[in-house]
């Protein structure tokens, strides 16, 4: 049931109890069809976050901040990823609506950006990895869209993209490995960050080739012999 008041509307269900919806969130709720729309009934009161306000519904959330009012409907890729990663407590509130870019879409949040494609699903890119991603042109650059979430690897963190890998560690910083180059291809073929850890140096010229150090080995490349990793007791 619902009851309308001067400054909001109260909704009640046996499962969710009673919650008021008001202000900008109520306007967005109305645009979504109120309780008969995809959002269903409210299941929380409106509450504050570091950057704005949010209210949870059976089918999604509505957020309101100085960046605007946005609706995230569960059942869509970005909204589902937002919920699964920890919601507003982890990535904050949306700063933009979903924006089409090439074969996918993205949406900017306070603490990261979510990317979605039909092939790769939805993945958030955040913090140091996001900064490196931006320096290479984001999804329109050679890296393309993310194809994994960020994950722990060796001494740091890594995230995979269509065109390469970005690896980060507190001690060594952030490095981008671009597929199509000798060392990056060998790194991928051997199992990538999950097997060799993250890069701890950039590619370094040496004689007629280059080398790059990783947590669990060093890759060497030359035009005549290609790329090879040296690891373990053989490296020692």
Question: Where is each model-derived feature located?
Answer:
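Extended, compositionally biased repeat/scaffold regions that form elongated interaction surfaces
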Residues: 1-236
């Amino acid at each position: 049931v619902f009851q309308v008041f001067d400054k909001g509307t109260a909704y009640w269900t046996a499962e969710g109890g009673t919650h008021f919806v008001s202000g900008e969130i109520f306007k967005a709720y109305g645009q979504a069809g109120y309780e008969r729309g995809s959002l269903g009934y409210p299941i929380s009161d409106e509450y504050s976050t570091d950057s704005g306000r949010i209210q949870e519904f059976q089918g999604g959330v509505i957020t309101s901040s100085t960046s605007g009012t946005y609706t995230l409907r569960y059942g869509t890729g970005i909204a589902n990823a937002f919920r699964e990663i920890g919601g507003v407590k982890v990535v904050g509130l949306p700063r933009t609506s979903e924006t089409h870019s090439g074969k996918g879409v993205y949406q900017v949040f306070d603490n990261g950006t979510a990317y979605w494609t039909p092939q790769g699903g939805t993945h958030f890119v955040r913090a140091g990895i996001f900064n490196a991603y931006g320096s290479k042109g984001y999804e329109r650059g050679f890296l393309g869209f993310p194809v994994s979430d960020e994950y722990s690897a060796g001494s740091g963190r890594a995230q995979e993209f269509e065109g390469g890998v970005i690896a980060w560690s507190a001690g060594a910083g952030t490095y981008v490995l671009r597929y199509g180059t000798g060392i990056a291809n060998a790194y991928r073929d051997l199992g990538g960050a999950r097997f060799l850890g993250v890069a701890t140096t950039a590619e370094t010229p040496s004689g007629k080739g280059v080398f790059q150090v990783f947590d669990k080995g060093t890759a060497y490349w030359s035009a005549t012999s290609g790329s090879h990793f040296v690891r373990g007791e053989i490296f020692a």
